């Protein structure tokens, strides 16, 4: 039988580790965000098979994004996030009313748990105005 093919996961950092690998390692492989369920080991918790991605092949999150209007949209991304371009693309494709907020000095995973960086004030202002 053929062996399963898994997405590459970083279990330890090396001199060749990319900035994205370092950022995700810092969250998912440290007490900051690592979770190992009973019966598993840390080395087996983040190994989705490549076939796990098939469900995304028929999903395009920007399809018909303009039809959300006239409901307001707030896109938030870290200014240093590798994923920032996705928020910028969504913002560009969305109809008004819309807003793009870049969090200064924040990367992608910083907005998971770094409460000093999460823009709670911006969220409150947006929801107070948008949920009238």
How would you label these PLM feature ranges?
Residues 2-6:
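Short, small-residue-biased leader/transition segments that mark boundaries at the very start
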Residues 10-41:
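Extended, charge-rich helix/loop segments that form flexible
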Residues 48-65:
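Active-site nucleophile elbow and catalytic-triad environment of alpha/beta-hydrolase enzymes
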Residues 66-69, 93-95:
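Short, conserved loop/helix-junction motifs that constitute active-site signature segments
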Residues 74-77:
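Short beta-strand/loop motif that positions the catalytic acidic residue
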Residues 80-98:
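Conserved loop-alpha-helix segment in the C-terminal half of the alpha/beta-hydrolase fold
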Residues 95-109:
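Catalytic histidine neighborhood in serine/cysteine hydrolases
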Residues 106-109, 113-132:
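Catalytic active-site module of serine/aspartate enzymes centered on a nucleophile-bearing elbow/loop
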């Amino acid at each position: 039988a053929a062996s399963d093919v898994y997405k590459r996961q970083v279990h330890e950092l090396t001199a060749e580790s990319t900035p994205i690998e370092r950022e995700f390692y810092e969250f998912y492989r440290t007490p900051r965000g690592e979770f190992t369920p009973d019966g598993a080991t840390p080395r087996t918790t983040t190994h989705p098979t490549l076939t796990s991605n098939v469900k995304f092949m028929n999903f395009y999150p920007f399809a018909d994004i303009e039809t959300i209007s006239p409901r307001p949209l707030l896109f938030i991304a870290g200014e240093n996030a590798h994923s920032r371009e996705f928020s910028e693309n969504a913002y560009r494709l969305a109809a008004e009313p819309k807003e793009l907020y870049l969090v200064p000095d924040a990367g992608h995973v910083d907005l998971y748990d770094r409460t000093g960086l999460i823009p709670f004030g911006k969220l409150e202002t947006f929801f107070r105005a948008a949920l009238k």
